[in-house]
Amino acid sequence: IKEPIPGLDIPELVRYGKERNVGLVLWTLWNPLDKELDEILDVYEKWGIKGIKVDFMQRSDQYMVNFYERVGKAAMERKLLVDFHGSFKPSGLQKKYPNVMTFEGVLGLEHDKDSRDINPVHDLILPFTRMVAGPMDYTPGAVNNATAEDFYINFVHPISLGTRAHQAALYVVYESPLQMLADSPSNYYKAPEFASFISRIPTIWEDTKAITAKIGEQLVIARKNGKNWYLAGLTDWNARNIEVKLDFLEASKYKMEIFKDGVNADVYASDFKTEEVMVSKDELINITMAKGGGWAAILTPVE
């Protein structure tokens, strides 16, 4: 993992990305890193890499816990961020080493390739369980979406259970300072409205309001970044209409850009609708979600 394959010029990719304000994070196996940690990270630093995603640890014995500590420290010394994939749940390492951004430690979206267990009910259990421990690299963002009736396991072209609006809402609900896009670039090119919307959702928050929540069933949450608020709802396999009072807002008027389930989302899970409305902080709004659905909005104050 210190030498790229022939034809792959990583320093050139770093240069190309830098011109476009994009940094590169390299995925790496844990075992080679364990054996040559300093040597490998020195190479990555020299290339201009911004961070590493370490994978397949799959253990939590003392040796492995020490490995996490070594990686966090060595990466910090080289100003590299770290994402521990294939990991145990966080236990505070990100407080000691702020360059440690996030951890998997969860049955995430990637397992839709081989299971029906990653579904809207599962998604609504995680905020009350795994997320309590710290940042969670669930890897949301599926573009191929299916109802419970239409879902089938497809390892080559994975499909998510629940609606596309459900996937959009996960970026607000799930906390991870380094968020992932789970799907292929080709699929995002085919879904520009979805890609554009989730690209505008921050990954760090100044304030959070739990509006309503019931484990495994439904929730609505509001988060703040700068002057903007981000509102999201999730539901299980039951369609819901939830009234939300916007009294948590500070300014009097906001532009609310909504990404929600389309009229046919209960039978075609990829169906969505976007709309833009003006709202005030004393308003009561309705969040309508299809079965397995979701709802997300960006609220920008209007001067």
Regions found by a protein language model. Give the residues of each.
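Aromatic- and carboxylate-enriched substrate-binding clefts and catalytic-loop regions
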Residues: I1-I159, T163
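Solvent-exposed beta-strand/loop surfaces of large extracellular or lumenal domains
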Residues: D55, I258-D282
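Acidic/polar loop patches that form or flank catalytic/metal-binding clefts of enzymes
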Residues: L80-G86, E110-K113, P177-A191, W205-K209, ...
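Long hydrophobic segments that form regular secondary structure
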Residues: A148-A168, V172-Y174, Q179, K224-W229, ...
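Glycan-recognition and catalytic regions of carbohydrate-active enzymes
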Residues: D183-Y230, N264-S270
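Carbohydrate-binding surface patches
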Residues: I215-A251, W295-A296
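Solvent-exposed beta-hairpin/edge-strand motifs
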Residues: F248-G262
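C-terminal beta-strand-rich structural cap/linker in extracellular carbohydrate-active enzymes
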Residues: E276-E303
